[in-house]
Amino acid sequence: MPKLRSATSTEGRNMAGARALWRATGVKDNDFGKPIIAIANSFTQFVPGHVHLKDMGSLVAGAIEEAGGIAKEFNTIAVDDGIAMGHGGMLYSLPSRELIADSVEYMVNAHCADALVCISNCDKITPGMLMAALRLNIPVVFVSGGPMEAGKTKLSDKLIKLDLVDAMVAAADSSVSDEDSAKIERSACPTCGSCSGMFTANSMNCLTEALGLSLPGNGSMLATHADRRELFLEAGRRVMALTKRYYEKDDASALPRNIASFKAFENAMALDIAMGGSSNTVLHLLAAAQEADVAFTMDDIDRMSRQVPHLCKVAPSTAKYHMEDVHRAGGVMGILGELDRAGLLHTDVPHVAADAGGNLKSVLAKYDVMQTQDDNVKQFFMAGPAGIPTTKAFSQDCRWPSLDDDRREGCIRSREFAFSQEGGLAVLSGNLADNGCIVKTAGVDESNLTFTGSARVYESQDDAVAGILGGEVVAGDVVVIRYEGPKGGPGMQEMLYPTSYLKSRGLGKACALITDGRFSGGTSGLSIGHVSPEAAAGGTIALIENGDRIEIDIPKRSIKLAVSDAELAARRETMLARGPMAWKPLSRQRYVSMALKAYAMLATSADKGAVRDRSKLED
């Protein structure tokens, strides 16, 4: 029978000092011997997705203590990618994922906690905590802050739905008046919560449901809705149930590495492809798989992208649906139910929402709105927006008049009526990306599935933005932004501003954009990222010259630089002749801090999840 990890610091005469300190935190005589559950909270006033999380740890703690545990809360950092976007702050976003993972590991192992609840929400916080949870392999439940309500405003007497990207595009569009731009800005982000579309934060919170590590509704229930309170309470109760199963019954199925197996990663990727999730999810799933020692790779993603249909279309891929609409249609469980009926889901895998001995099949039987007989579940998925600006969690209890169970023309479709029979993400490869690259096909217009154009090369995102706004980029160009990968940036910046500015200039369907950086979940259009190897690691993207022809064929999963092998070999020799300046941008002026240099020293390319290169850390 496994011994409580916390016994290391609570048992024996030699631990008198440690017990004295535990007592100073409120632990009583009769508490010693109970499991100590760590609560990793990511509350911060910097981030709308986290601004309402201050008291959530106390909610979870109350449920843990009522179930017989000791709850101890700590905090992690949280970067807002939207606020960090478009300037040097974005260099810190992806590296913060590793810091979050490390900090959770440090706190949990330093204090010998027995189990963990992760309160996360936004872009790098959920992935960082996920990496830590799989690294630690102690009982864990994830519960996020939930999505924000979609913005709404009237323009030209027409009510429209909005999100963050709309504000960015409108601000850069000279045809939009100052008055309308300000109106959109003030309406785009009305409440607390993660941005309202299927951007990275919401994508990752949905994927934790599919991995089996969070409760039904975690990814889609609005941050403002009163029903979300129960998710926090149940997270506390569930982590205690998992803790007892492992430590008292020696049930290893309660551990995250046994829940998040290869099959579970396939389920998560199937969901991601079906819902057209952010391309960043590929990066984070690959990183999490490495922490779990699961051999899930880009090859698996490529294989699945050819098999799984696109069943759910959400902003930024459409203006019609946001996360509140996904929830009304049954949330993640609704999409998983359709994947199951299509024969594309493993249902024989454990799940934190299942009782001992149960699995995803039993969870779907209760929570898939197309098969459940539970009226409470149906009411749960009818939770809707109030349309009242607020930073308070659980501040409203509005409900839709009915569920969206239209699987032919609704937000979630059956396989027969899928938005497309191939999924919302694709892996492309060719001589421009030997180890692959990613495109969010859910956001690509059918007319752009094949594209050939002339390269317009930039050595940084800043130069690309200046070029787009300055009129250098014209219809038919393929904008190439390089040296923005994990090493080259360093930090692998998101390219939301370049793609937004292409749209605002009327070039959204007339140009393509290729980068060894990455894209915001808010990106749509022919935007191809994660080019691997990156420029700084000797990738072919570093050898592209202005005017080179680039051929993109998404149906064939191909991306090709139409330059002969002999010419590429000559360019590579020229690059190597630069000595210490090889594989570096010649003209870019960018301050890189010691912290970012340390990150870059160990960072791998995107095809490995941009995690640390373990080979450099082995004895």
Curated annotation (Swiss-Prot):
Q: Active site annotated at which positions?
A: S520
Report the residues modified as N6-carboxylysine: K124
Q: In its UniProt record, which GO terms are filed under biological process?
A: isoleucine biosynthetic process; L-valine biosynthetic process
Tell me the keywords, alphabetical order.
2Fe-2S, Amino-acid biosynthesis, Branched-chain amino acid biosynthesis, Iron, Iron-sulfur, Lyase, Magnesium, Metal-binding
E.C. no: 4.2.1.9
Recall the GO molecular function terms of this protein's record.
2 iron, 2 sulfur cluster binding; dihydroxy-acid dehydratase activity; magnesium ion binding
Q: How is the cofactor bound?
A: Binds 1 [2Fe-2S] cluster per subunit. This cluster acts as a Lewis acid cofactor.
Catalytic activity reported: (2R)-2,3-dihydroxy-3-methylbutanoate = 3-methyl-2-oxobutanoate + H2O; (2R,3R)-2,3-dihydroxy-3-methylpentanoate = (S)-3-methyl-2-oxopentanoate + H2O
Protein name listed in UniProt: Dihydroxy-acid dehydratase
Species of origin:
Shewanella sp. (strain MR-4)
